Structure formats: C-alpha cells, structure tokens
C-alpha cells in the first residue's frame, strides 16, 4: 500500500506557484475547450481517479454548457469524494455523480460510455508502461467518436510523453494540444477519430505500481488511486 495521503496531497493545488496548480489550470483549459467544441445537446463526461473533482467542477461552475453535462467521477478515497460532493453542491451541479470506488473497473463507466469527454488525469505516473498503453486502449471504448481524452503525466527521465502520444495516435486519436515540454508536469488532449468498441462490463483496466515506476511488475499501491 502507498504511504502517501491522497487527501492532503491536494493542498498543493492551493499553492499558485506549484506544478500541480499549473497542471490544474492546463486541464481546466482543455475541459473548457472540449465543452466549447461539443455539439449541441447532452454531453457525457467520465473522470477516472477523479480526486476531489477540482478540474471538472471548477470549469462547470461557470461554463454555459453546465446544464448539458452528465458526469461520473470515480475516486477511491472517501475523503476526496466527500470534498467533491461539497464542491459540486456549492456550484449547484446536480448532473454530477460522484462515486467512491475502484476507478480501474470498467463496470464503473459502462452505462455512460462512450463519453464526449474522458479525464485521465493523475493515472499514468504510477503504472507500468504496459498498463499505460492498456488504459489508452480502453479509451477507445470509453470515448465517443469526436470526443476528447485529457490526460497528464510527469516528464521523468526517460520521458514517456512521446510514447504516450504515439500510443494514442496509433489507436485513432489525433493530438489536439500538448503542454510546453519545458515543464516537469505534462498535460495532453487527444480527440478520438475512430468508432468506439464495446466496453466489457467486468474488466480491470489497470493496476498501480507506485510513484515514478515505469517497468516493474510489483503493485505497491491500491488500484484506481494515484496522482502521477
């Protein structure tokens, strides 16, 4: 089990000079852009390992498409989901469903997939390379045609970001935006140009290995719960 406290970890979002604060701003910009570009009508959003939901809730609080959005945010730590419930209530967002549970399970998303926006923020820093690629493969089932996946990954050496982009692009996604490589944190957005495959009900999309481990097979953290 990971010794990191994922509830107190969110405090860095409140520091304007932190890398996480910058990353949050990037993610929110991509969410706004995806909502701005979404066709008229309902918009479905899935957030994997949603934490306190600051990215999505922070945008929807003031976005003109807020009433069109039905979203499910899945997060393992109940303290974080409690915080997300408070934020959603304060923003008067009844279209958000906040689930305390294992974000790796496809059963959490099957009735809302494929979605117009998929948030995979904080996933890719604690998986093996194989599980990152596997999760991206599942994005072809989670994401609707024309939908967007917003994702994050720190640029540890060796920098895996180019391979992540290649994995997306090899599965029918086109790059919409990528953050400046001069920063340690990275945010990307890829739009799905293919047709979504069916999502199986009982699959496990990924398992976690611990912070900044790309190749080792040993799982040291709980599934569905990391922020790399």
Residue ranges of predicted features:
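A short SAM/SAH-binding and catalytic strip from SAM-dependent methyltransferases
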Residues: 115-131
